[in-house]
């Protein structure tokens, strides 16, 4: 791995899963479980990679729709 790859990996590890709003983790987790249940996905270690990928895409769509709905208020 080149130096750029190592730096990129360190940056990702440092910043991954840091929420912008402190205390938002509970709300994010609740949203994940609600969206998963809407699609019949049981979150857990036995969930397939395919189901996780589909689920991740749906979360992204929901977040984009929420941001569009809220507009520039935040």
UniProtKB/Swiss-Prot annotation:
PROSITE patterns in alphabetical order: SASP_1, SASP_2
Keyword terms, alphabetized: DNA-binding
Matching InterPro entries: SASP_alpha/beta-type, SASP_alpha/beta-type_CS, SASP_DNA-binding, SASP_sf_alpha/beta
A GO term for molecular function: double-stranded DNA binding
Top-rank lineage group of the source organism: Bacteria
Claim: DNA-binding is one of the keywords in the record: yes
GO biological process, any: DNA topological change
Similarity annotation: Belongs to the alpha/beta-type SASP family.
Name used for this protein in its record: Protein SspS
Annotated gene: sspS
